[in-house]
Amino acid sequence: MSATASVATRHDWSLAEVRALFEQPFNDLLFQAQTVHRAHFDPNRVQVSTLLSIKTGACPEDCKYCPQSGHYNTGLDKEKLMEVQKVLEAAAEAKAIGSTRFCMGAAWKHPSAKDMPYVLEMVKGVKKLGLETCMTLGRLTQEQTQALADAGLDYYNHNLDTSPEFYGNIITTRTYSERLQTLAYVREAGMKICSGGILGMGESVDDRAGLLIQLANLPEHPESVPINMLVKVKGTPLAEEKDVDPFDFIRTLAVARIMMPKSHVRLSAGREQMNEQMQALAFMAGANSIFYGEKLLTTKNPQAEKDMQLFARLGIKPEEREEHADEVHQAAIEQALVEQRESKLFYNAASA
């Protein structure tokens, strides 16, 4: 397949086609991915997001990779839903260090009715700070999805994790079809989709291909596709899994870029385990989004300063959003924080 042949957006990928991409010589695959990438993006710009865990631990799901699952003893303390004000303060800090998108994650099977007002207030508050908003709250009803859209949520993250064939080996408390249904609700409500998967759970190359096929063959490609490397946490069933070969990880990023040419492909969890050379290869393969800051939910993430140093060495700059002038934007931040302190939803969000 020529480097330009896969620039067009497609939704009809077959396993044989995707397998052929994975089997290309490494240099040919990276050349094709970089060519596709340059057709749609500035190759020297990377979108920067910050992720905050707004509710940690005791999740009823049994995802074998996750330290937040209540099924496993990982030493992670259960925490209540964060106060709205604290979330906004964290968002303001993220803005100050260069993030353009603020992602909020809660360890839930699905959000409860009592928590939804606070979640919606978080979305509205973060939007006032001039950041794009993203949330991952588990499975959603159609009504909850619409409420989030009405509050101004830009992105909803709901990963497929792996192929349909391998999925049952990793999760039994939520079906693949339920995940796809949530994505359908998100799209129907007019929000953007963030959905990807995890490498290193014992899956085959065909499973990696199957995951990408599920994502690329959706009616519309996800705007953001996070590709995670398993972070092995003691106490989870996958703690002793074999490490992913770095070249296999880069291959998956490259194939994702070719199959979903207009999507942001995010270098997500597991980045702390990657040296600078591997991260540089990831950007060459078409990754153009990262999580930035001190923590990625409950696992470590490279320090923000190191990220900017690497960007400088590679000649990469963060993507920018159109926004207010600095003075106006700072005033907007301060006003949003004042309004939030005065809100009746400010105190003890978990006890409502």
From Swiss-Prot:
Its cofactor is [4Fe-4S] cluster; [2Fe-2S] cluster. [2Fe-2S] cluster binds at C103, C134, C194, R266. Keywords: 2Fe-2S, 4Fe-4S, Biotin biosynthesis, Iron, Iron-sulfur, Metal-binding, S-adenosyl-L-methionine, Transferase. The keyword Hydrolase does not apply. [4Fe-4S] cluster binds at C59, C63, C66. One of its GO terms (biological process) is biotin biosynthetic process. It catalyses: (4R,5S)-dethiobiotin + (sulfur carrier)-SH + 2 reduced [2Fe-2S]-[ferredoxin] + 2 S-adenosyl-L-methionine = (sulfur carrier)-H + biotin + 2 5'-deoxyadenosine + 2 L-methionine + 2 oxidized [2Fe-2S]-[ferredoxin]. It is an enzyme of class 2 (transferase). GO terms for molecular function: 2 iron, 2 sulfur cluster binding; 4 iron, 4 sulfur cluster binding; biotin synthase activity; iron ion binding. InterPro entries: Aldolase_TIM, BATS_dom, Biotin_synth/BioAB, Biotin_synthase, Elp3/MiaA/NifB-like_rSAM, rSAM. Catalyzes the conversion of dethiobiotin (DTB) to biotin by the insertion of a sulfur atom into dethiobiotin via a radical-based mechanism. Belongs to the radical SAM superfamily. Biotin synthase family. This is Biotin synthase. It comes from Pseudomonas aeruginosa (strain ATCC 15692 / DSM 22644 / CIP 104116 / JCM 14847 / LMG 12228 / 1C / PRS 101 / PAO1). The lineage of its organism: Bacteria, Pseudomonadati, Pseudomonadota, Gammaproteobacteria, Pseudomonadales.
